[in-house]
């Protein structure tokens, strides 16, 4: 173990900061010698108090305590939630009660919260007492404990009330860091890196050097069990002794910087605000992401953004930004809010641009409304001595990923520009490989600092190829190559992002590695696009040369696995080089290390031959000379040997990147010079100026080492008929945008510029040729693809360039940079402020080769830019497809049709598509001829194609049962699900499946038992799916239709078409505690009457297997007609049955609930935060209820525990909060209501248990848990039925008595009173429903509309139209139907007219097996008011055509005219018309009286319709609106003669009535008892 001494740091003229390791004795001695007092008060929080070292410190203090002194201890609850005025007051009350006086010394032992709050206590207690800081977190050690800032938080914001109060001493004992959790340790490193970054370049470099070892040690922290006074506890332990010197030094150096700055500016009037580097933007992020994101994590992101701002303003070099970003990442800190792990950690919270700017506007550094930010000049030095005012425009650009480019109109006022592009990516990557394989140190200057080279450097280190260090403040990389002798396999994959060059070069390097221990291979992988790019020809050549390489996913692309035991033999190697010259360069550079000399023979002329020449010339610089064969074309001889590194190697600027500023000059008529690229360049793209721009009318001056271009007047570039860009393929994109602006009336080529020799550009970061054609068309520029090139039609004048909605960049740096130029030529000549800018998406992709391109375009070339925030996609605008997976016979075909109909999607069966796409017969035929393996490969290719084409186009894609058999297809499924696509696993009972498959001759036979196939695939189905749905065996038509109805609602809910919302009105859910729901279905149907949801207590189930739980959930949906489910697992500590510490099973079950698409999921707030994080991140459409139960009665409603839990729930972004306490007296109900009234940020379910807590259940507003008389017992003490709640609520005035009426004449036989009164009685509502017979609407107005107790009116004939004149507003249905059957009184005295007849029709049909969206024709018999309601209902059910027949057609013609044209109503007059119809009719409604026989002509028409064949996916169904008798003549004819399903008008009556019931009362009517009451005579 390293040893460190004690260091004292001076601040404000005193050596009061003491830094060391294990300072217990020193602290005690110093405090008692220097701070003499009668009372010492040690304040810490509960987390710190349980650390053994805290007890050891207190013991040392007790031991050294002077004889006449005493020591008191006070422990507060941990966390920012308790950093309040209330907690401060409690500490002060304690000190007053203990008789503390002005000589008291307070010791704050803890993190920043304790230091801030206890310091504020010391500042105000007895008008100020002495205090000592003992910081226990890294953040507190280097930041909050230094400088004397003290404060508490308020509801208005953090640290709003406090003071400056300097501590007597700050004892920084780094031993505390041993028990600091890993994330907190890393969190503190942000402040450490910040101080080095702004003040101490040498320390910054030291931090860079030690990052790897630091993270290795901190990541190795482990949980240990320790005994404390409070009992055994678990703590994080990090063995910092391994890095003690480094940790001590980083703490000390950071403190020195802050102490120096504070001493110069104690009250933060100038210099001290430099310490806020990263904080202006970081604090804004923190305000939105707290508490999931820690302070240091947000400051880390803020530092990167503020460094990028400094670069954007031409103050900081790109190299310095890259260093800062790299070191932050190296210490485990986030550098962007979009990093995957950080987004997951922060629950995907959004950080809207305008909110960030608003948060920044309240920064204390600001100058009024002007935002001020600390800018960086270089690592170790700030720009100026205080923060600088920056514009919102510049901030917007830095904070967003979309660039807005304004016309380049104003740039011509500037003089010539000298631009030095970053180092060449091609040369940088080659130099790194050669230097790493070479022997000795090589200083590489002007290296490109980009994503590509970053991945290459990391890979070189990971393979132990070289030792890497930096000089010249990070501008020079020093590669100490090991000569190829130390290359060893890696146990971690080499992740290469989308770095194609690195992947190809490293594939050959990997063939040279040696195994070591368990490490016997190298895996190369990358991002999704990288895994599509080709590497096949290179791999094939390596394989033929003895290297064992496996593809781990798609054949021909990464990831690949290179086995270390195989050898790169050498000898003659044949290579196909028409796709990429990088294959050739890769083998060339590694060839000297083969076992024998290499002869590399290329199969024909290689693409981009100049890049091969570049490689050969560079190899010679490093000591290996390649000889070209004199006898064979494109053949090279490479001797064995070892590279000898030159002392220095200077990378040329990237010639491809240089084309952008040169093209800028060409387009704008300005002058640009590139000072380090000329005609002697290694790079083919150096010819761009002479070969492309000069013939187009530019003035070009090129020397051996520099290139200058001056453009003609804007709009006068001349077209170039043809250019072969094979030597400079990457520059073709720049040529395209210049060509788009070229025009000449004398041109022989008709302004069509042909570019060839660029076929390889189709397999770069994207298909660049197609990308250019597609994006140019958005500007109004015509372009066509050629087999090896592109043709671009230049516009006749710049004013013809159009403004595109947005430019897609395809995550391709060259696409983005090219179109940033053309964008500036749109509306050229107009003032930028008067024009709509061009939006360029994903602008940060330029970081691959030129991270500072936008900065150069803005600050050096003078372009006007702004930033734009991508708008979140509206779910309604996205038709994200649904993929169905599951075993054969799982119902994918049937359910697929249901799914497509419910969503209005198209259905695509992958097996049918296979036959069409490949033209090789059916799947069964193909398998018989070619075997399963060949089929699986083809299936994967097809599936990838289908997803690419249809994933956002509204398709239901039904796959074969074995789609999960291949890793490639599983990856496609997982990626689709990860981006929000629905992958739905359908399954049935496996025994039923086996039984069915044994009798199905249409499918290719399995070569193994079905159960074995299921056992193998089951885990894959779970892994790949985002949702699961269990389909039970249906033995009757009714069961089948019930399942269809349930599935339709399920699929619409999980896709967001039927959103699930937390109720905003009084609502309840019934609690089910059965061990098995299946035997209790009838009881459950009755138990849910009047409820908005049903809770299944999963902890009570007899079996926790996924299969059992999913079967229970489907059964519950079927029993309750898809009532929303509350999925609850209650642990024992929270009053349930589930084991408290079985977190793995609990999380698995919660995931089952989410994948089952439950509408609500109860998530206990006491569960470990990682479980919270994972569940919240995959909540999909499920609403989360954050719950906390106090069964022990430990906490009153005034206790801070509830405040803490409420803040926790808000921070977790749950959708509703549920708090359950235990009432000890009636007054607890009043305390609860006081709490409820103050906590309104989220919907709150808050109740007390026990008898004396019943009132709280009555007063609770939303989702009150209830029991039912039909259940065996209540789920919790004091639980009430819905009827009891309503009766009690009414008795205390919560529900006022109301009167409802049916009006019209005659109404003597009306069943409405019995319908509604049955519902009121069942639910305990204080309402009555009576008849009010009249044929005068005016009497209704005078007698009823003026009543204060009026709750609603049902209107029947003859008043449905007459009453409308007295109403204030009509619903859309009432307007369209032209009649009102429901009057709704509003609180403001207005009356709304509604029509529920159409709902009665629609819901009656749906209840009898008709889907919500029929997608077929409908038939209406009759022409009265009910016929109009039927027409409206049919339109809402998406009937394609509505046919109408009647005894007299004149009435129908008038009715047809009164409806909108989109209803597509057709009046049928004759039988001949019916015979000519081809469209099937699936639903019908009879609206003619049932007390008289049908007219013969009408009866014939009806029979003609009913006898036509029906091609619907459901039984054709007819409703007779007449409800007496139950079976009318029309229903008898339809069912008995023509096989239609009959639906009685009594159902329509009840359905329209329960719709009224819900509108008037807010409660769901109990359908079954209401229906029974209505239909019984």
Swiss-Prot record:
Q: Which reaction does it catalyse?
A: 7-phospho-2-dehydro-3-deoxy-D-arabino-heptonate = 3-dehydroquinate + phosphate; 3-dehydroquinate = 3-dehydroshikimate + H2O; shikimate + NADP(+) = 3-dehydroshikimate + NADPH + H(+); shikimate + ATP = 3-phosphoshikimate + ADP + H(+)
Q: Where is this region: 3-dehydroquinate synthase?
A: 1-392
- The record lists NAD(+) as bound by 80-83, 111-113, 116, 136-137, 158, 176-179, 187
The EC number of this protein is 4.2.3.4, 2.5.1.19, 2.7.1.71, 4.2.1.10
Q: Name one GO biological process term.
A: aromatic amino acid family biosynthetic process
Q: List GO molecular-function terms, semicolon-separated.
A: 3-dehydroquinate dehydratase activity; 3-dehydroquinate synthase activity; 3-phosphoshikimate 1-carboxyvinyltransferase activity; ATP binding; metal ion binding; shikimate 3-dehydrogenase (NADP+) activity; shikimate kinase activity
Binding, Zn(2+): 191, 279, 295
GO cellular component terms attached to this protein's record: cytoplasm
**Its pathway?**
Metabolic intermediate biosynthesis; chorismate biosynthesis; chorismate from D-erythrose 4-phosphate and phosphoenolpyruvate: step 2/7; Metabolic intermediate biosynthesis; chorismate biosynthesis; chorismate from D-erythrose 4-phosphate and phosphoenolpyruvate: step 3/7; Metabolic intermediate biosynthesis; chorismate biosynthesis; chorismate from D-erythrose 4-phosphate and phosphoenolpyruvate: step 4/7; Metabolic intermediate biosynthesis; chorismate biosynthesis; chorismate from D-erythrose 4-phosphate and phosphoenolpyruvate: step 5/7
| Active site annotation, chain numbering | 268, 283, 845, 1189, 1218
Which amino acid positions bind 7-phospho-2-dehydro-3-deoxy-D-arabino-heptonate, per UniProt?
127, 143, 149, 159, 191-194, 258, 272-276, 279, 295, 364
Q: How is the cofactor bound?
A: Binds 2 Zn(2+) ions per subunit.
Annotated spans, Shikimate dehydrogenase: 1297-1577
InterPro entries, from UniProt? 3-dehydroquinate_DH_AS, Aldolase_TIM, Aminoacid_DH-like_N_sf, DHQ_synth_AroB, DHQS/DOIS_N, DHQS_C, DHquinase_I, Enolpyruvate_Tfrase_dom
**NCBIfam families noted in UniProt:** aroA, aroB, aroD, Shik-DH-AROM
The free-text function statement in the UniProt record for this protein reads: The AROM polypeptide catalyzes 5 consecutive enzymatic reactions in prechorismate polyaromatic amino acid biosynthesis.
Q: Which HAMAP family match?
A: EPSP_synth, Pentafunct_AroM, Shikimate_kinase
Which PANTHER family does the record cross-reference, listed alphabetically? AROM/DEHYDROQUINATE SYNTHASE, PENTAFUNCTIONAL AROM POLYPEPTIDE
Name of the protein in its database record: Pentafunctional AROM polypeptide
Q: Which gene encodes it?
A: ARO1
């Amino acid at each position: 173990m390293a040893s460190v001494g004690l260091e004292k740091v001076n601040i404000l003229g005193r050596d009061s900061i003491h830094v060391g390791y294990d300072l217990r004795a020193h602290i005690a001695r110093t405090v008692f010698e220097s701070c003499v007092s009668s009372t010492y008060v040690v304040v810490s929080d509960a987390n710190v108090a349980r650390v053994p070292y805290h007890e050891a410190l207190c013991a040392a203090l007790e031991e050294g305590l002077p004889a006449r002194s005493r020591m008191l201890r006070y422990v507060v609850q941990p966390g920012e939630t308790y950093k309040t005025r209330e907690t401060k007051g409690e500490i002060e009350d304690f000190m007053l009660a203990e008789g503390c006086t002005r000589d008291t010394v307070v010791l704050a032992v803890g993190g920043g919260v304790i230091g801030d709050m206890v310091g504020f206590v010391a500042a105000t207690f007895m008008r100020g007492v002495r205090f000592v800081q003992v910081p226990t977190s890294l953040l507190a050690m280097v930041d909050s404990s230094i400088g004397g800032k003290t404060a508490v938080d308020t509801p208005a914001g953090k640290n709003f009330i406090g003071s400056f109060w300097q501590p007597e001493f700050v004892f920084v004992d780094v031993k505390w860091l041993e028990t600091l959790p890993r994330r907190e340790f890393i969190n503190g490193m942000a402040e450490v890196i910040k101080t080095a970054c702004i003040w101490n370049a040498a320390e910054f470099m030291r931090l860079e050097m030690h990052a790897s070892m630091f993270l290795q040690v901190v990541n190795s922290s482990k949980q240990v069990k320790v005994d404390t006074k409070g009992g055994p506890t678990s703590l994080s332990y990090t063995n910092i002794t391994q890095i003690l010197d480094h940790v001590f030094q980083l703490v000390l150096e950071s403190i020195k910087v802050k102490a120096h700055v504070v001493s110069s500016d104690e009250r933060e009037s100038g210099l001290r605000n430099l310490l806020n580097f990263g904080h202006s933007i970081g604090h804004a992020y923190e305000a939105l992401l707290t508490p999931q994101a820690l302070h240091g994590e947000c400051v880390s992101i803020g530092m990167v953004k503020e460094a990028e701002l400094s670069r954007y303003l031409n103050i900081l070099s790109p190299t310095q930004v890259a260093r800062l970003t790299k070191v932050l990442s190296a210490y485990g800190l986030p550098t962007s809010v979009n990093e995957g792990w950080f987004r997951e950690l922060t629950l995907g919270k959004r950080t809207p641009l305008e909110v960030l700017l608003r948060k920044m506007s309240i920064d204390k550094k600001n100058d009024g409304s002007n935002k001020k930010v600390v800018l960086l000049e270089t690592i170790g030095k700030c720009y100026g001595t205080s923060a600088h005012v920056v514009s919102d425009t510049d901030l917007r650009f830095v904070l967003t990923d979309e660039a807005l480019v304004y016309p380049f109109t104003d740039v011509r006022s500037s003089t010539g520009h000298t631009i030095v592009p970053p180092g060449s990516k091609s040369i940088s990557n080659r130099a790194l490989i050669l230097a790493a394989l070479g022997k000795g140190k090589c200083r590489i200057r002007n290296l490109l600092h980009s994503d590509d080279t970053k991945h290459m450097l990391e890979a070189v280190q990971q393979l132990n190829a070289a030792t890497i260090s930096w000089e010249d403040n990070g501008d020079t990389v020093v590669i100490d190559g090991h000569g190829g002798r130390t290359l060893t396999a890696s146990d971690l994959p080499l992740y290469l992002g989308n770095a194609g060059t690195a992947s190809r070069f490293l594939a050959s390097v990997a063939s040279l590695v040696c195994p070591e221990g368990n490490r016997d291979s190298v895996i190369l992988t990358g991002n999704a696009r990288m895994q599509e790019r080709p590497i096949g020809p290179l791999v094939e050549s390596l394989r033929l040369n003895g290297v064992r390489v496996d593809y781990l996913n798609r054949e021909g692309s990464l990831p690949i696995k290179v086995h270390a035991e195989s050898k790169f033999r050498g000898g003659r190697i044949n290579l196909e080089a028409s796709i990429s010259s990088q294959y050739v360069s890769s083998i060339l550079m590694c060839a000297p290390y083969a076992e024998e000399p290499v002869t590399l023979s290329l199969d024909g002329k290689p693409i981009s031959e100049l890049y091969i020449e570049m490689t050969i010339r560079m190899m010679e610089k490093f000591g290996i000379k390649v000889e070209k064969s004199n006898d064979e074309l494109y053949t090279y001889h490479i001797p064995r040997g070892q590279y000898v590194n030159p002392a220095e190697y200077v990378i040329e600027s990237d010639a491809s990147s240089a084309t952008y500023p040169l093209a800028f000059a060409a387009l704008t008529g300005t002058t640009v010079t590139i000072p380090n690229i000329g005609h002697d360049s290694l790079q083919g793209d150096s010819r761009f100026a002479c070969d492309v721009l000069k013939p187009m009318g530019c003035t070009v001056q090129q020397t051996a080492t520099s290139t200058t271009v001056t453009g003609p007047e804007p709009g006068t570039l001349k077209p170039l008929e043809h250019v072969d860009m094979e030597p400079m393929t990457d520059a073709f994109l720049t040529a395209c945008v210049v060509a788009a602006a070229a025009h000449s009336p004398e041109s022989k080529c008709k302004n069509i510029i042909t570019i060839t020799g660029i076929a390889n550009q189709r397999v770069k970061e994207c298909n660049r040729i197609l990308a250019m054609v597609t994006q140019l068309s958005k500007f109004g520029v015509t372009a066509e693809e050629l087999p090896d090139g592109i043709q671009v039609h230049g516009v006749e004048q710049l004013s013809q360039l159009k403004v595109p909605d947005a430019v897609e960049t395809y995550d391709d740096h060259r696409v983005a940079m090219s179109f940033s130029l053309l964008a500036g030529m749109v509306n050229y000549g107009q003032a930028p402020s008067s024009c709509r800018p061009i939006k360029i998406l994903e602008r940060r992709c330029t970081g691959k080769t030129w991270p500072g391109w936008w900065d150069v375009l803005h600050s050096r070339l003078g372009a006007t830019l702004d930033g734009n925030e991508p708008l979140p996609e509206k779910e309604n605008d996205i038709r994200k497809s649904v993929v169905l997976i599951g075993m054969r016979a799982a119902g994918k075909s049937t359910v697929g049709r249901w799914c497509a109909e419910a969503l209005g999607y198209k259905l695509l069966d992958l097996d049918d598509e296979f036959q069409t796409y490949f033209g090789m017969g059916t799947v069964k035929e193909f398998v018989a001829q070619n075997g399963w393996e060949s089929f699986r490969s083809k299936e994967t290719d097809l599936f990838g194609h289908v997803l690419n084409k249809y994933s956002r186009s509204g398709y239901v894609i039904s796959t074969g049962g074995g789609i999960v058999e291949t890793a490639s297809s599983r990856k496609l499924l997982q990626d689709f699900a990860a981006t929000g696509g629905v992958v739905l696993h359908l399954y049935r009972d496996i025994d039923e499946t086996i039984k069915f498959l044994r009798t199905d001759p249409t499918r290719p036979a399995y070569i193994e038992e079905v159960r074995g196939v299921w056992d193998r695939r089951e885990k894959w189905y779970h892994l790949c799916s985002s949702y699961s749905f269990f389909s039970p065996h249906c033995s009757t038509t009714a069961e089948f239709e019930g399942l269809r109805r349930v599935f339709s609602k399920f699929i619409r809910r999980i896709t967001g078409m039927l959103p699930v919302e937390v109720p905003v009105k009084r609502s309840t859910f019934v609690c089910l505690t059965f061990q098995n729901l299946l035997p209790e279905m009838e009881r459950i149907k009755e138990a849910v009457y009047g409820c908005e949801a049903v809770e299944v207590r999963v902890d009570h189930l007899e079996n926790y297997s996924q299969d059992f739980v999913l079967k229970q959930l489907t059964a519950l949906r079927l029993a309750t007609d898809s009532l929303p489910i509350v999925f609850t697992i209650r642990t024992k500590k929270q009053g349930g049955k589930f084991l408290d510490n079985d977190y793995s099973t609990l999380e698995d079950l919660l995931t089952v609930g989410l994948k089952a698409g439950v509408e609500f999921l109860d998530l206990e707030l006491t569960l470990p935060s990682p479980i919270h994080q994972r569940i919240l991140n995959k909540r999909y459409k499920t609403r989360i209820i954050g719950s906390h139960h106090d069964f022990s009665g430990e906490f009153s409603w005034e206790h801070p525990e509830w405040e803490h839990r409420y803040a926790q729930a808000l921070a977790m972004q749950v959708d509703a909060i549920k708090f359950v306490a235990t009432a000890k007296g009636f007054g607890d109900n009043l305390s609860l209501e006081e709490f409820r009234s103050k906590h309104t940020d989220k919907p709150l379910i808050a109740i007390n248990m026990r008898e004396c807590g019943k009132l709280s259940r009555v007063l609770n507003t939303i989702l009150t848990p209830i029991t039912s008389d039909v259940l065996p017992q209540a789920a919790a003490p004091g639980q009430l039925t819905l009827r009891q709640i309503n009766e009690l609520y009414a008795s205390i005035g919560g529900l006022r008595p109301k009167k409802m009426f049916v009006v019209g004449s005659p109404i003597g036989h009306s069943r409405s009173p019995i319908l509604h009164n049955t519902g009121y009685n069942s639910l305990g509502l204080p309402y009555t429903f009576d008849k009010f017979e009249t044929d005068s609407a005016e009497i209704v107005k005078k007698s009823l509309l003026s009543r204060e107790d009026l709750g609603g009116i049902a209107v029947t004939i003859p008043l449905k139209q007459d009453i409308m004149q007295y109403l204030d507003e009509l619903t859309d249905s009432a307007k369209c139907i032209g009649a009102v059957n429901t009057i709704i009184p509003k609180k403001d005295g207005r009356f709304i007219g509604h029509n529920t007849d159409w709902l009665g029709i629609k819901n009656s049909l749906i209840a009898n097996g008709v889907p919500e969206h029929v997608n077929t024709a409908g038939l209406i018999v009759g022409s009265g008011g009910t016929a109009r309601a039927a027409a409206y209902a049919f339109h809402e059910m998406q009937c394609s055509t509505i046919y109408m027949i009647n005894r007299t057609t004149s009435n129908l013609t008038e009715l047809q005219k009164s409806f909108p044209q989109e209803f597509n109503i057709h009046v049928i007059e004759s039988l001949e018309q019916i015979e000519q119809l081809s469209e099937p009719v699936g639903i019908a409604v009879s609206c003619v009286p049932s007390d008289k026989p049908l007219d013969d002509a009408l009866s014939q028409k009806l029979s003609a319709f009913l006898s036509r064949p029906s091609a619907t996916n459901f039984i054709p169904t007819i409703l007779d609106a007449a409800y007496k008798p139950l079976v009318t003549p029309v229903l008898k004819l339809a069912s008995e003669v023509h096989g239609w399903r009959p639906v009685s008008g009594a159902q329509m009556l009840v359905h329209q009535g329960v719709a009224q019931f819900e509108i008037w009362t807010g409660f769901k009517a109990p359908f079954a008892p209401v229906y029974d009451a209505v239909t019984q005579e």
